[in-house]
């Protein structure tokens, strides 16, 4: 497995690719794909569903069913930008979106201005 490092605002995450290569839109082995949105602002400083204090600049995500603590590699299909997030909240609860990302993750994925992006998601570490 080759390690691809993704720098965050406060921390660096190490992502392990199943393909042995740095993930790109052409070789990304996604567990699921779909529309992602992001949230921040009024939620910053509030408690998430698992009790964490939400940091809009962090690298976290809301997912409807994945266990809290699950680490995901998320890639913006259009740009190829990727980052690792950890599930600490529930959602999204609107439309056909599959994941809601913190503002920090959305910024890393270059999806702030669009608000939504088509993403591919790989489960790196699933908490039981």
Indicate residue ranges for each PLM-predicted region.
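Secreted/periplasmic proteins
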Residues: 1-128
């Amino acid at each position: 497995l080759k390690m691809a490092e993704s720098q965050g605002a406060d921390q660096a995450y190490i992502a392990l690719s199943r393909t042995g290569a740095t993930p790109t839109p052409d070789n990304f082995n996604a567990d699921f794909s779909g529309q992602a949105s992001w949230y921040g602002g009024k939620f910053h400083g509030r408690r998430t569903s698992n009790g964490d204090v939400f940091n809009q600049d962090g690298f976290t995500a809301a997912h409807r069913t994945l266990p809290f603590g699950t680490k995901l590699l998320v890639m913006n299909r259009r740009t190829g930008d990727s980052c690792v997030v950890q599930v600490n909240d529930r959602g999204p609860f609107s439309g056909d979106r599959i994941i809601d990302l913190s503002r920090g993750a959305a910024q890393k994925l270059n999806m702030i201005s669009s608000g939504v992006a088509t993403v591919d998601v790989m489960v790196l570490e699933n908490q039981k």
